[in-house]
A protein has these predicted regions:
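Feature captures hydrophobic
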Residues: 1-104
Length: 104
């Protein structure tokens, strides 16, 4: 199963960010992931980084979304995702996660 560093590499290699915008995933004790469309980079060492949207989700549920096993809208409606900031940007979440496919 992919860890945070592997996910960061996969997302970076697939340009999984929204140009000009910053989306931060807060995985709680599992860390953070910043999709930095300003710097055109994906990093995981920036817990305090500013973001246009912050999405709180468990790392396990994030991986399920990236594998296509969990729909972002469904996860939000079930309370598995909490969003702060630009809600419109968060609505693009499915298009971002569709740029990657995790195995296992």
């Amino acid at each position: 199963m992919a860890d945070l560093n592997e996910v960061t590499q996969i997302m970076g290699a697939n340009n999984a960010f929204v140009p000009g915008k910053r989306i931060k995933f807060d995985f709680g004790t599992d860390g953070t992931l910043l999709l930095d469309g300003v710097a055109e980079a994906v990093t995981n060492d920036n817990a305090e980084a500013d973001a246009d949207t912050t999405i709180k989700i468990s790392f396990d549920n994030f991986k399920k979304m990236a594998k296509g096993d969990l729909n972002a809208t469904t996860a939000f409606m079930m309370g598995k995702i909490k969003i702060s900031g630009d809600m419109g940007l968060a609505m693009q979440l499915q298009s971002v996660t569709s740029k990657i496919k995790l195995n296992g």
